[in-house]
């Protein structure tokens, strides 16, 4: 960004020019924005107009009491539209009621408007505005910085609250300074003093230590002036202060020590941040926390490059391919993307941009060259040679291969490569040496500079230059002489030469290498994998090769021998595939340093006895040497590790094996007799091999036998005595092998592969330390006892397998029984039960089995165990799906499963068991691997969304699947770990699991297979020994509020997966029977719906649609109830009879009266009758009632009213009236005890009471009208006389004081009872209770009948009575 682009234009009125705006300007300058232009004039002057046009960001201070200059506003908006200028509006002094500015800004698309508010001070408004301006001004520099900022803040916060030190490390231009500035801007306000010294090494060289200290600390922070004479003065002033110091681009630890003095003179909680491209700086400064800055990802890189190159959306499509080449070359390097983007700006056609980019690659940016050259100059000669060799020849090569060659050159690469890594010049990734493309080009430019200065080049890699040196000019004397390469090149100076002959064809002259006395590395190859030979030819012979050669790599070497005068005393590797060699050389040569011989597909080779002189030989690769008849006895080659003789068809016998050999490949040889440890040759066409392999003689140190099929092998001998060091045994595709002996003596055997042994029926026993077992496609019916060490078991396609012995302590971590159709479901269940116990035992400390996860217990867990825990799943399993499996495992239809986790489970939480059923299309055969991707989504209590995705690998490619399969995965990585800083409440909320099949590239397999059912189980230390189908899924839906469209959609998906009969049950509960007792609801619904209600409730509970409380009540979350009612309302227009029935039931005017008689109620307790009525259809019970009290109810803002019968003096009947907790439109009346007198007469009815039939126990109406209330037992009234069973009622004489005592006792007991009622739905609110009590002294319950809407009102207000008039009498 140029200087003019950093201008910030501020438009304001004069009243705020020296108040708010001055603070804003000063804050911007503190952030490094020095070009701030403030315009407070009413009119737009020429200078103001110029600044508006040049500014990158315009801040418009819009007042509430004055108008703004329309000229300035129009000009700013015009620049925003035509020049991509950023406008930041600030409403200052605008009251909330003044919405004109907000409406106008909203219409213009301003999504971010800063507004002064009563609760927001001016300082806070300044802070918000500055942050917004800064981010918009330096937008490109901020790309990709946020995620890095979070990571480094987390690293800082983990350090103890002493003086904290953090290093930021990375290659030049990767963004170290930008990240340090972001941290400084973010955290500087938390410190008493702070300073950021950019390019620290240069600053301290120019100003000196004392001047720099005075400039950064004393003048600004302590208010002192003058020269620092005593360092102790500064230390005293900063001793107890929290100080933030950022030293950028430090190249030497000594200058840090002189400036900071060991960091010990700052106050506690101070923070020192050092950025450097040299990791050794941090080590010498004792900075242990080091953050390595990575490059931008592809999306961020494309975004930055498009901005810098000014590529709009239309041009992006045309230039996308070229842009991706630039991005791939830059490899996420921000500085390179910025520089290349600006250089390529204006190139609108792909060919034009590509040509310009190729020119830029030839000459890297000077700023980057200087930075790399400065690091290069600090290296010693050996390290420089290593750097140049990697830049020219070894980019992306195996690190061991590079180490071996450079070690042979005497460069001590084990030390040198570490130095290059610390200086950010190379990296080691996936065991390969990596160098950024820019650094590689700079390294090669250093070589080219040598040519310009001395006319000499030490390393050659350009094909045209090498061709000019090697080509036989006599054969091409008529060709035009090449001028691209200097003829003054001195062959004696050449140390390395790598020639790619993919597009070349020429003749190499006879004396091409005579003068190359220092040539260490020589390689002729073809980079085109489709070309199997190199187009170069030698006419006659080759006179010589340099004796200092360490690497001789010559593909398709055309001669039968190497030059006789070549002395390979320094040779480390011979790699000559597809050569015409018959023998390496005649006579005896000293091969002391030779470690690798690769002569693959040298079909003329007949003798290899020369390798016996290579005492340090490690690798021999003679694959495809079809004329080679013998392999020498290599027993004395103590370092030999790898021998590959595959395809050597003329080799009939194999000699003594070296003691330390690790890998032996005899595939396709003619060997007919081998020890068991070598196993078999691979020659599919050879049918007369021995049917029995003899014992293990002389092979005690063989560690791996990587051999392919021996189709005629029928039996393995048991006569061996010495098991040796055999660690891997592969017998795959031995189609005639029928049995396998007991191999318990092979104690070091770790892997056994019997895949493809289609006739194998019997296995006697396995080695006790076996870790991997493959029985794919065998005919085994019963697997013997598995070893306790087994971790991986694959029995895919074992169609005859019926049982597996389960008398073992633990199971493999991963095992597959796909296409094992005869395997019983009980065996599958036993495996799952045992696997859960393994998870508990392996991943939970012993104390947690009883006491749960205490903090001390977690702290006692070893760090290594936790790291191992995060690497893999705890358990995975695959088997064919069975018909009755869905009901046992309770898999819900669909590919998603929703659960809610109770916070109390965290103490015993182990992980999750995820069960997925996958349907495969007919003829499915996977050729890209198969796995299942699990996406887990959740929200915490604050409503923040989280997401985690894990990919569960199921099997390798080539597996044909014939029917549906069930996959089970136990994941222990998802459990919260407070030691790692995770939010402990994160798993207390709604969690959604989504599953879909993927291939090896994690792309969905939509057409060939689909997830049909799934389920999730919570595994705790409590249920670890429980059968998988008896483990309840995570149920609790009510502990906290659920909200959001995403959650509602998940609930609807869960409902949609139900069968129709269970949908009906769900809707009845949502509309009618929430908070009701299961024993009451089950028989009632059974009369309405022909179903097993108990099982249906269990189905809904498993799907987390309801919960059955400890006292037997059905509980449904309010969001689910609301969803059910919406479904009824939405479906009401359809002809579905079920929906019509439920809809009509919810608005019906009939009354439900249900007599509850619980078996647990004692005989001396009064019966209760509950009447539930709709507020729009109130009912009558014929009696006259007097209100004697009311009290608040926990979990409800409204009271409960208490009434006693006033129809007859001395009656014990009582009732309670309250609002339903689930539906505010429903009133709940609870009758306690029975009346001891006849019904009122008609005369009394006219005076305030009515006559009717007894309401003791009304018939249950099958068409329910509304939700039934909670069932509560009445208080113990054993001291009272019992009510008569039926009229006529006996007259009783009761004293008035006894009645009052009874009322008070009932009220007190009820208060105590409600004190312990749990708050199930704190979010539910009831309607105004005053609407229920329409008169302060009289309560009327009315109802609406089908014939019309009629209400009855009681007129007796003098005695505090409530008159209930039934609709039957009113309808008369």
Swiss-Prot record:
Q: Where in the cell is it found?
A: Nucleus
The protein's matches in PROSITE patterns, at most eight in alphabetical order, are given as:
TIR, WRKY
Q: Which GO terms describe its biological process?
A: defense response to bacterium; innate immune response-activating signaling pathway
Segments of this protein annotated with the region Disordered:
1246-1288, 1337-1372
Q: Name one Pfam family in it.
A: NB-ARC
Q: Anything noted about its domains?
A: The TIR domain is a signaling domain involved in cell death induction. It is involved in heterodimerization of RPS4B with RRS1B, but other domains also contribute to the interaction.
Protein name per Swiss-Prot or TrEMBL: Disease resistance protein RRS1B
Give the species: Arabidopsis thaliana (Mouse-ear cress)
Q: What is the lineage of its organism?
A: Eukaryota, Viridiplantae, Streptophyta, Embryophyta, Tracheophyta
């Amino acid at each position: 960004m140029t200087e003019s682009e950093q201008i910030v234009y501020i438009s304001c009125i004069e009243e705020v020019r020296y108040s708010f705006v001055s603070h804003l300007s000063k804050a911007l300058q503190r952030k490094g924005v020095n070009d701030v232009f403030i315009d407070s004039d009413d009119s737009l002057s020429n200078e103001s107009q110029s600044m508006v046009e040049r500014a990158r960001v315009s801040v418009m201070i819009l007042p509430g009491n004055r108008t703004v200059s329309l000229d300035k506003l129009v000009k700013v908006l015009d620049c925003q539209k035509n020049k991509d200028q950023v406008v930041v509006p600030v409403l200052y002094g605008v009251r909330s009621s003044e919405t004109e500015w907000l409406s106008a800004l909203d219409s213009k698309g301003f999504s971010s408007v800063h507004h002064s508010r009563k609760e927001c001070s001016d300082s806070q408004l300044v802070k918000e505005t500055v942050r917004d301006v800064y981010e918009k001004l330096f937008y490109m520099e901020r790309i990709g910085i946020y995620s890095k900022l979070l990571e480094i803040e987390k690293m800082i916060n983990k350090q103890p609250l002493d003086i904290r030190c953090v290093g930021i490390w990375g290659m030049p231009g990767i963004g170290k300074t930008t990240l340090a500035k972001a941290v400084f801007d973010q955290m500087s306000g938390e410190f008493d003093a702070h300073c950021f010294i950019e390019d620290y090494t240069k600053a301290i060289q120019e100003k000196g230590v004392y001047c720099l200290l005075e400039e950064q600390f004393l003048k600004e922070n302590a208010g002192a002036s003058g020269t620092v004479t005593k360092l102790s003065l500064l230390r005293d002033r900063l001793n107890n202060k929290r100080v933030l110091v950022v030293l950028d681009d430090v190249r030497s630890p000594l200058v840090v020590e002189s400036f900071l003095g060991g960091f010990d003179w700052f106050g506690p909680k101070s923070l020192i941040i050092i950025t450097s491209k040299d990791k050794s700086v941090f080590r010498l400064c004792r900075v242990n926390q080091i953050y390595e800055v990575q490059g931008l990802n592809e999306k961020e890189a494309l975004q930055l490059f498009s901005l810098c190159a000014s590529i709009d959306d239309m041009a992006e499509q045309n230039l996308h391919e070229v842009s991706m080449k630039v991005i791939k070359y830059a490899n996420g390097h921000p500085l390179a993307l910025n520089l290349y983007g600006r250089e390529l700006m204006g190139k609108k056609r792909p060919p034009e941009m590509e040509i310009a980019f190729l020119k830029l690659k030839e000459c890297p940016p000077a700023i980057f060259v200087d930075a790399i050259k400065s690091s290069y100059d600090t290296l010693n000669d050996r390290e420089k040679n290593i750097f140049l060799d990697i830049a020219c020849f070894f980019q992306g090569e195996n690190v061991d291969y590079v180490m071996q060659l450079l070690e042979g050159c005497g460069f001590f690469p084990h030390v040198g490569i570490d130095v290059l890594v610390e200086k950010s010049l190379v990296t080691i990734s996936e065991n390969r040496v990596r160098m950024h493309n820019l650094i590689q080009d700079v390294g090669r430019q250093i070589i080219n500079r040598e040519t310009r200065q001395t006319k000499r080049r030490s390393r050659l890699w350009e094909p045209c230059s090498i061709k000019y040196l090697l080509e036989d000019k006599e054969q091409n004397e008529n060709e035009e002489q090449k001028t691209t390469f200097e003829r003054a090149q001195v062959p004696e100076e050449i140390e390395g030469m790598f020639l790619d002959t993919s597009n070349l064809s020429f003749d190499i002259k006879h004396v091409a290498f005579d003068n190359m006395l220092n040539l260490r590395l020589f390689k002729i190859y073809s980079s085109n994998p489709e070309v199997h030979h190199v187009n170069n030819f030698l006419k006659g012979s080759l006179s010589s090769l340099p004796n200092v050669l360490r690497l001789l790599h010559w593909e398709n070497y055309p001669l039968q021998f190497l030059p006789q005068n070549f002395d390979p005393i320094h040779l480390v590797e011979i790699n000559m595939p597809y050569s015409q060699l018959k023998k390496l050389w005649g006579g005896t040569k000293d091969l002391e340093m030779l470690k690798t011989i690769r002569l693959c597909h040298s079909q003329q080779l007949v003798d290899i006895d020369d390798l016996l002189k290579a005492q340090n030989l490690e690798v021999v690769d003679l694959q495809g040497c079809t004329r080679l008849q013998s392999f020498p006895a290599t027993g004395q080659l103590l370092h030999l590790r790898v021998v590959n003789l595959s395809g050597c068809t003329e080799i009939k016998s194999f000699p003594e094996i070296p003691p330390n050999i690790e890998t032996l490949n005899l595939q396709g040889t003619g060997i007919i007799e081998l020890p068991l440890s070598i196993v078999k040759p691979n020659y599919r066409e050879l049918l007369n091999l021995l049917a029995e392999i003899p014992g293990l003689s002389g092979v005690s140190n063989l560690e791996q036998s990587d051999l392919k099929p021996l189709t005629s092998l029928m039996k393995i001998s048991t006569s061996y005595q010495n098991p040796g060091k055999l660690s891997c045994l592969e017998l795959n595709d031995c189609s005639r092998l029928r049995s396998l002996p007991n191999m318990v003596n092979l104690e070091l055997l770790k892997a056994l592969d019997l895949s493809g042994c289609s006739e194998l029926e019997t296995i006697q026993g396995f080695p006790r330390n076996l870790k991997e077992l493959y029985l794919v496609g065998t005919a085994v019916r019963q697997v013997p006892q598995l070893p306790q060490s087994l971790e991986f078991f694959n029995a895919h396609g074992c169609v005859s397998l019926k049982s597996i012995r389960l008398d073992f302590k633990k199971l493999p971590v991963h095992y597959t029984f796909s296409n094992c159709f005869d395997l019983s479901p009980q065996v599958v269940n036993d495996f799952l039960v045992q696997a859960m116990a393994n998870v508990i035992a392996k991943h939970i400390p012993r104390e947690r089995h009883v006491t749960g996860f205490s903090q001390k217990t977690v702290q006692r867990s070893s760090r290594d165990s936790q790291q191992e825990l995060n690497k893999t799943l705890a358990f995975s399993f695959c088997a064919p799906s069975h018909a009755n499996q869905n009901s046992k495992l309770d898999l819900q239809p669909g590919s998603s499963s929703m659960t809610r986790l109770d916070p109390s489970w965290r103490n015993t939480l182990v992980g999750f068991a995820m069960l997925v059923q996958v349907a495969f299309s007919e003829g499915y055969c996977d050729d890209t691997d198969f796995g299942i991707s699990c996406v887990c989504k959740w929200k915490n209590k604050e409503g923040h969304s989280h997401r985690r995705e894990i990919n569960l690998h199921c099997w390798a490619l080539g597996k044909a699947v014939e029917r549906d399969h069930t996959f089970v995965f136990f994941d222990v990585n998802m459990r919260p770990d407070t030691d790692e800083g995770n939010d402990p409440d994160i798993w207390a909320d709604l969690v959604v699991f989504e599953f879909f099949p993927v291939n090896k590239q994690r792309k969905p397999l939509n057409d060939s297979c689909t997830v049909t059912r799934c389920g999730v189980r919570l595994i705790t230390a409590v249920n670890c020994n429980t059968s998988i189908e008896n483990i309840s899924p995570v149920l609790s839906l009510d502990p906290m509020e659920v909200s959001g469209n995403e959650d509602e959609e998940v609930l609807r998906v869960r409902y949609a997966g139900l069968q129709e009969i269970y949908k009906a049950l769900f809707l009845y509960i949502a509309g009618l029977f929430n908070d009701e007792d299961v024993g009451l609801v089950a028989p009632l619904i059974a009369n309405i719906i022909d179903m097993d209600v108990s099982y249906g409730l269990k189905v809904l509970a498993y799907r987390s649609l309801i919960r059955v409380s400890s006292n037997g009540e059905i509980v449904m979350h309010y969001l689910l109830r609301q969803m059910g009612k919406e479904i009824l309302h939405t479906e009401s227009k359809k002809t579905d009879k079920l929906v019509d029935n439920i809809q009509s039931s919810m608005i019906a005017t009939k009354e439900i009266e249900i007599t509850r008689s619980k078996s647990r109620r004692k005989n001396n307790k009064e019966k209760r009758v509950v009447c539930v009525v709709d507020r729009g259809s109130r009912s009558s019970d014929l009696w006259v009632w007097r209100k004697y009290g009311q009290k608040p109810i926990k979990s409800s803002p409204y009271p409960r009213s208490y009434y006693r019968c006033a129809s007859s003096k001395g009656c014990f009947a009582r009732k309670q009236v309250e609002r339903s907790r689930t539906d505010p439109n429903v009133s709940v009346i609870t009758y306690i005890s029975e009346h001891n007198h006849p019904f009122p007469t008609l005369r009394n009815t006219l005076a305030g009471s009515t006559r009717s039939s007894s309401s003791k126990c009304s018939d249950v109406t099958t068409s329910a009208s509304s939700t039934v209330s909670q069932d509560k037992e009445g208080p113990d009234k054993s001291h009272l006389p019992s009510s008569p069973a039926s009229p006529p009622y006996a007259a009783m004489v009761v004293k008035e004081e006894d009645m009052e005592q009874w009322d008070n006792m009932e009220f007190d007991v009820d208060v105590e009872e409600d004190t312990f009622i749990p708050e199930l739905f704190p979010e539910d609110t009831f309607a105004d209770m005053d609407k229920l009590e329409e008169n302060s002294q009289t309560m009327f319950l009315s109802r609406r009948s089908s014939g019309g809407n009629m209400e009855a009102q009681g007129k007796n207000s003098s005695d505090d009575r409530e008159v209930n008039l039934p609709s039957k009498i009113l309808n008369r």
